């Protein structure tokens, strides 16, 4: 499947081109290909707090969240995941920070996928060790590039966090994965700047057909954070770019899930759960 291919989506009488991507699965949820665009969020509890985390996950699922991400930054978090995953109503992804061994521990705990930041785990042997284990378990990995934590070498090469630097970071990580025969990949190239984020995703969509996870980093609290995140995510979705989305708000994660679901419904990309209430200012 060549990058840049599109399929047609009939949305409320309009024909919209959606970029065709490879399809992968996170647990029982398909991402990419012709699968519906999914909503993700992230828990704010300590992952070691099993009951508190599960309570939040159930609330997220009720709000329309399809996939949830939990931090795995210490042994206690990995132990918590081992109890959370079998009781979660939706697939669980482990968010890995700086220690590749935490990724291996999360895999052992039974998570449905991983998120790795190339700017935080940079040694090729560590990256390949995680990819090899994920390959053997059939688990997908998101390459989570962030403009604020790029590899210093790329930052110096491009004179800053440019779209080109972010795309190259993703491509470098993907090359390490391919060296060990791992291809269950999705990618994000997030930034707190909407124009930077949008351009990075556009450039990435031109060079790969892996599923893309959309988001604006540190969008902030509502309402400004909602506006900022929507500006970036909706722009790309209307261009046919994006297979899964997350609002990153300084707020209860349930608000993230609701916002993501409502955006997809507003764009005609997911079926509405609720009736639209339309207020006409000129009506009596």
Q: Which positions does each model-derived feature cover?
A:
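Active-site mouth loops of central-metabolism enzymes
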Residues: 34-52, 71-73, 90-98, 119, ...
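Glycine-rich, proline-tolerant flexible connector loops at the mouths of alpha/beta enzymes
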Residues: 42-50, 61-88, 115-123, 185-194
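Catalytic alpha/beta core domains of metabolic enzymes, predominantly
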Residues: 146, 154-284
